[in-house]
Amino acid sequence: MNSKIFAVLLLLGLLSCVLSDQYCPKSSITACKKMNIRNDCCKDDDCTGGSWCCATPCGNFCKYPADRPGGKRAAGGKSCKTGYVY
């Protein structure tokens, strides 16, 4: 009996961990002209209010996490600069 209760609790714990994952939202834009590409952020620390720095075809923008995968976190790095990327 105790092992069944333990198994159920373990399963519920694992399920809650999986369901609580958050991701960058999927971008609705598939392409962007080079002259319109800009980065508002390069890393999560550039964002405020619990938002993340997410990569889109038009640059990096601060977005609130979504429950479904599909988007991509910005890679950042030394070559990343904020502003327009010509």
UniProtKB/Swiss-Prot annotation:
Expressed by the venom gland. The keyword Lipoprotein does not apply. InterPro entries: Elafin-like_sf. GO terms for biological process: defense response to bacterium. The keyword Signal applies. It is found in: Secreted. Residues 1-20 form the signal peptide. Contains 5 disulfide bonds. GO terms for cellular component: extracellular region. Keywords: Antibiotic, Antimicrobial, Disulfide bond, Secreted, Signal, Toxin. SUPFAM superfamilies: Elafin-like (SSF57256). Disulfide bonds join 24-54, 32-58, 41-53, 42-80, 47-62. Residues 21-66 form the WAP domain. GO terms for molecular function: toxin activity. Belongs to the venom protein 11 family. 01 (wap-1) subfamily. Has antibacterial activity. This is U15-lycotoxin-Ls1g. It comes from Lycosa singoriensis.
